[in-house]
UniProtKB/Swiss-Prot annotation:
It catalyses: D-fructose 6-phosphate + L-glutamine = D-glucosamine 6-phosphate + L-glutamate. It comes from the Bacteria. Residues 289-429, 461-600 form the SIS domain. It is an enzyme of class 2 (transferase). Residues 2-220 form the Glutamine amidotransferase type-2 domain. Keywords: Aminotransferase, Cytoplasm, Glutamine amidotransferase, Repeat, Transferase. Homodimer. It comes from Buchnera aphidicola subsp. Baizongia pistaciae (strain Bp). It is found in: Cytoplasm. GO terms for molecular function: carbohydrate derivative binding; glutamine-fructose-6-phosphate transaminase (isomerizing) activity. This is Glutamine--fructose-6-phosphate aminotransferase [isomerizing]. PROSITE patterns: GATASE_TYPE_2, SIS. The lineage of its organism: Bacteria, Pseudomonadati, Pseudomonadota, Gammaproteobacteria, Enterobacterales. Its EC number is 2.6.1.16.
Length: 610
């Protein structure tokens, strides 16, 4: 969601801040701003609603933004509308601050500060922190560090932030609470950001702050205290992300690029995890993990958005292949209800970023209950979920910039299928299913390449659907969640209203929506449910609904049926295969409608607040 980039150097930091802000755009934002301390020890601040180019234009106009220390922020509105006055940084006399998170008790603090003469110019919770730091600093005459340590004890919520003080222009202070923060290491300069992508042009060396850490940065020194105010040393991590991996290349949008990267992402997901004798192995899982997998009798899967749909698919795999009961729940619901943990249960959390706030809360809450352990599947080795879980498996999908997840979804499914097969072998001591899954997955990268050859057919369908206001997706079995994912993608990217239903539910209500204007996408692979879904197709046809069917080369339909045939006749991999044309469909509908595909309105790539 919101993005932080800050720098302290022997040289002017303005360009570093601007370039960093540009690289944070993919996270989603509606306003932005930056502030520096100049040679006169003045705080110079620029803020703007809308795009970062507005800030760049302001810099060119003022020609005053020169300083060796600065903080910048891209804001996604939570408290207060998307207005200039609510954009960060927020300033209180000598204090300037940027903040990611939500302060839950800000109104109480605000009231007390107003009684002490503080005037608020924004509607945000962040301005409360700035004034509170100033108030405590002047009241107690403490050092900036001691003041901040006092202030955070009075805050309830999440408050990852970076603070600078014009009376102390040689240091930045950063606090990690709730949202991720990392330090970038340079020569005679250091940086703080919420996302390493913002700094990859200037450094590959990073220090990831732990929850509760406070860091003090000068241009040549870094000091870190943990949540207990004890001096600590955090390891330096060298990033292996190549700078060209975060460019669009010859593609118009990141989403299109990432859809087409799926054959290679899946190959990376299975690389070194399938042996020559068709065995599945995860180097991340030690003997303790295998012992845990052997004991589990139930799995609770927790996720949000697209990851939730991946979890829904895997429920079918775990129950059919592993013979383990499985519950899939939205993280934000799981966090705030009383629940019963079944005997010998595993908590399995899915997240693209590994920083999803609701999923983190679910993981932390689960530690109060008697789970055998927690397993996280995500795409970031340095994420909070990986750090706080018992075990983790990386999808190895590569950097995903587009807000709508594509290759993260298919690699999650790939890993989940492998886990289901592995558990089957561990529990039954029979390698047949594991061998079959391993052998089939070897073919998956090539199959996905062939599926992408349907691109022009999908574009033609998108042209037909681009002016439609309502679209229904239906599927059965493990392809019902793929219908859900197809509808979600269309909503996210093209802003077209779409709903997904289990096909058998049509006659229980949704069939009332069907008439000659109703567009219905049907997922109909040649599996054991094909006759059932053909009955659903007949129900729709007799009511005049307009059908668009995705199927294989074996399944026969009436001659006048609009069918897009995919080059896969199997059953096991159909969820992974059939979602790819639905991703393309959402992309092309959005393209034809002229939408901002990589940065859809009101959405963020990494949802780091509840």
């Amino acid at each position: 969601m919101c993005g932080i980039i800050s720098a302290i150097s022997k040289k002017n930091v303005t360009n570093i801040l601007i370039e960093g802000m540009k690289r944070l755009e993919y996270r989603g934002y509606d306003s932005s701003g930056l502030a520096i301390i100049n040679k006169k020890k003045e705080i110079i601040r620029l803020r703007s609603q809308g795009k970062i180019k507005n800030i760049i234009n302001l810099i060119h106009k003022t020609k005053q933004l020169i300083g060796n220390i600065g903080i910048a922020h891209t804001r996604w509105a939570t408290h207060g509308l998307a207005l200039k006055k609510n954009a960060h940084p927020h300033v209180s006399k000598n204090i300037a601050i940027v903040h990611n998170g939500i302060i839950e008790n800000y109104l109480n603090i605000k009231t007390k500060l107003q009684k002490n003469g503080y005037i608020f110019t924004s509607d945000t919770d962040t301005e409360v922190i700035a004034h509170l730091i100033h108030y405590e600093q002047n009241k107690n005459n403490k050092s900036l560090l001691k003041t901040i340590q006092t202030v955070i004890l009075k805050l309830t919520g999440s408050y990852s932030m970076v603070i600078m003080d014009r009376y102390h222009p040689n240091i930045l202070i950063a606090i990690r609470s709730g949202s991720p923060l990392l330090i970038g290491l340079g020569k005679q300069e250091n940086f703080i950001s919420s996302d390493q992508l913002s700094l990859l042009k200037i450094t590959k060396k990073f220090i990831y702050l732990n929850e509760g850490d406070i860091a003090i940065l000068s241009h040549k020194k870094i000091t870190i205290f943990n949540k207990n105010s004890i001096l600590v040393h955090r390891p330096i991590v060298i990033s292996n992300i190549q700078n060209d991996s975060i460019t669009k290349g010859h593609y118009q949008h990141y989403m299109k690029k990432e859809i087409y990267e799926q054959p290679y992402a899946i190959k990376n997901a299975i690389r070194n995890r399938i042996t020559k004798n068709e065995k599945i192995q995860f180097s991340e899982l030690n003997n303790n993990a295998h012992a845990l997998l052997l004991k589990i009798e139930h799995i609770d899967i927790i996720a949000c958005g697209t990851s939730y749909n991946a979890g829904m698919v895997s429920k079918y795999w775990f129950e059919s292949l592993s013979k383990i009961s499985c519950n899939v729940e939205i993280a934000s619901e799981f966090c705030h209800r009383k629940f019963i943990v079944k005997k010998n249960s595993l908590l399995l959390i899915l997240s693209q970023s590994g920083e999803t706030a609701d999923s983190l809360t679910a993981l932390r809450n689960s530690k109060k209950h008697e789970y055998l352990g927690s397993l996280v599947i995500c795409n970031s080795s340095s994420s909070s979920l990986v750090y706080e879980s018992n075990f983790s498996i990386l999808t190895n999908a590569g950097i995903e910039i587009g807000v709508a997840s594509t290759k993260s979804f298919t690699t999650q499914l790939t890993i989940l299928l492998m886990i289901a097969a592995k558990i089957n072998n561990l529990k039954t001591n029979d390698e047949k299913i594991e061998n079959k899954v391993a052998k089939t997955l070897r073919l998956l990268p090539e199959i996905t390449k062939n599926v992408l050859k349907c691109d022009s057919l999908i574009y033609s369908l998108a042209k037909e659907l681009s002016d439609k206001n309502n679209i229904i997706f239906i599927g059965r079995g493990h392809n019902y969640p793929i219908a859900m994912e197809g509808a979600l993608k269309l909503k996210e990217i093209s802003y077209t209203h779409a709903e997904a239903y289990a096909a058998g539910e049509l006659k229980h209500g949704p069939l009332a929506l069907v008439d000659s204007s109703t567009q219905i996408i049907v997922i109909a692979p040649n599996d054991n449910l094909i006759d059932k879904i053909k009955l659903n197709i007949s129900e729709i046809r007799t009511r005049g609904g307009v059908l668009h069917i995705f199927s294989d080369n074996l399944t026969k339909f009436n001659d006048n049926t609009n069918v897009i045939r995919l080059p896969y006749d199997g059953i096991l991999l159909s969820p992974i295969i059939y979602v790819i044309p639905l991703q393309l469909l959402a992309y092309y509908v959005a393209l034809i409608k002229g939408k901002n595909i990589d940065k859809p309105r009101n959405l963020a790539k990494s949802v780091t607040v509840e």
